[in-house]
């Protein structure tokens, strides 16, 4: 069972997505999804939030900053229910607040990006694009800091290229509670122009 919380302002998306391995039993009817705010819980009818036929569920009845814990069971035609799965938890973080550069601001080719810390975030990733919706050109590392410097982008092989003067670029920050920077929340998008 895997749970990933997401708070993505651009998509007006606040949810925790649950995925698990399918049960191969011939008489399988579906799955029951249980949720609690306590890590060690026993699946009971008062904690049942959904019955689904496929091994995926999107929980949209969540609040930002609350950790939710989930277990899933399988049930068959005779209404026999399996034991609860290994638990998983998800958390939708508050949106990162971008500090600079902000819309309309001039920046150097080695732009320093900064944002306010997000409670619960373990890492951040800055995404720089050539349009509001596509054209990612950044390859900055994950950071636990609330600043990052754009030193250049890789264009071919290992050669680095700076941001181009007089061009407008867009940026956002992804905050994560998981290893590898899986997105839990994505900031609004700001733009800036390179001097």
Predicted regions and their residues:
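Extracellular low-complexity, O-glycosylation-prone stalks/linkers
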Residues: 25-47, 121-140
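Short S/T/G- and acidic-enriched coil/turn segments that sit immediately N-terminal to beta-strands
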Residues: 53-58, 111, 145-159
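An aromatic-rich alpha-helical recognition segment common to small helix-rich domains
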Residues: 20, 33, 59, 68-72, ...
């Amino acid at each position: 069972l895997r749970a990933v919380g997401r708070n993505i302002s651009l998509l007006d998306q606040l949810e925790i997505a649950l995925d698990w391995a399918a049960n191969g039993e011939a008489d399988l009817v579906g799955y029951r999804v249980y949720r609690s705010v306590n890590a060690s819980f026993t699946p009971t009818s008062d904690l049942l939030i959904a019955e689904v036929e496929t091994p995926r569920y999107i929980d949209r009845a969540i609040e930002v900053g609350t950790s939710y814990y989930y277990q899933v069971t399988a049930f068959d035609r005779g209404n026999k229910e399996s034991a609860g799965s290994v638990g998983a938890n998800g958390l939708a973080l508050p949106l990162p607040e971008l500090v600079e550069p902000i819309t309309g601001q001039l920046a150097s080719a080695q732009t320093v990006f900064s944002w306010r810390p997000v409670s619960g975030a373990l890492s951040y990733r800055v995404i720089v694009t050539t349009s509001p919706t596509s054209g990612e050109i950044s390859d900055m590392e994950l950071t636990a800091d609330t600043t990052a410097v754009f030193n250049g982008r890789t264009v071919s092989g290992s050669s680095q290229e700076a941001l181009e003067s007089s061009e407008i670029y867009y940026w956002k920050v992804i905050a994560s509670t998981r290893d590898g920077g899986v997105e839990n929340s994505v900031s609004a998008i700001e733009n800036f122009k390179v001097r």
